[in-house]
Amino acid sequence: MSEVKVSLKGRVIALLLGCVFLVTISEFVVRAVYPSWSEFYAGRYMVTESVPGHGIVAVGKAGFDGYFAQNNGDFRAHIKINDFGLRNDDPAVAANQRVWILGDSMAFGWGVEADEMYSSVIGELINTPTYNVASPGTNVCGYQALAARMPKDISPAAVVVGLIIENDLSNYDCPATAKAAESSDRASTGSTFNLGTIKQMLSKHSALYNFFAVSLKRVSIMREALIWVGVIKKSHAYRNPLEGKDMEQIAKATANELDRLRNMFDANTKFVVQIAPARFEIANDDPAYIAARLRLREALTERGIPYVDPIDRFKADGFEATHFIHDGHWSAKGHRIAAEETAAWLRSNLPQ
């Protein structure tokens, strides 16, 4: 009986070792024949930085020059980060008296080439140099941090803040948030080992995982199966993080922090908020997001903060024409629409 048990145990061990060997060999083979596997991980070109008085903010990895792609085939874009951690060819000191574009992933140009992102298109349209001061994963408090870390001996000719309705509206208190971050050692007190972190880890380290992710996501029946079991999310699935919250207070708090951002610059510096309307309003006239956008506009007006709202242009051109198929970000067409609307405001308000 013991011999049978040993035999079964040995077979199981042999099977496991064989699987490990097969996966290891496959990993090395895929790395050799599929060198672009690492392009799907955005963390390759992003780092975090502590900004005194503003806490932690995400910025680009200085000197990065490579490609970033979506494994669903939406895009493959060249990303070049300068020595200051921003997506510009010129150094930060060259930003003096340019039009600064502050924002998160949309302003950063997620998925589009550098000459297609709206900061670049604005510069072409108004024949005035611009400078991209944007970083994925930030919010209004992060925009304050990005502005604060710019060289102290330079200043903008104007500031455009890209504000995303879906992500950037919150009951902010940026000074309190920064103070809490600086007084904390930011140590994790609980486990974050879940499906999301596993996928992120595999995206970062495994060529084999990325190969299968690309292959499966591009086969319709397999993609639907993965959505059904919860491994991947449905494209443009409805989400509203503001649901059930006090929209009046959220709009007011957001406008207050945008005003704080405006006051970080000289009083004569032209300042405008470019509103990025929600996907679900553009595609389906979602009433919750319509209400959120209109309440934000009211709060900005109460604060005397100018804004550009390109909702009519986006609705005229349509959701599919202005966004990536699976990703929630603007395509090159969406960037151009936003740039044209904002450029019109700048032409009317900047000295000629």
Predicted regions mapped to residue ranges:
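Hydrophobic membrane-insertion alpha-helices, especially the h-region
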Residues: I13-F28
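N-terminal Lys/Arg-rich, disordered targeting/topogenic segments
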Residues: M1-L8
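Short, amphipathic alpha-helical "lid/cap" segments that border enzyme active or binding sites
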Residues: V140, Q144, A251, A255, ...
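Membrane/wall-proximal cationic-aromatic binding patches
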Residues: V33-T128, R239-P241, F314-G318, I325, ...
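Catalytic His-Asp segment of secreted/periplasmic serine-dependent ester chemistry enzymes
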Residues: E281-Q352
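Conserved SGNH/GDSL esterase-like catalytic core that processes O-acyl groups on lipids
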Residues: A92, F108-A187, S191
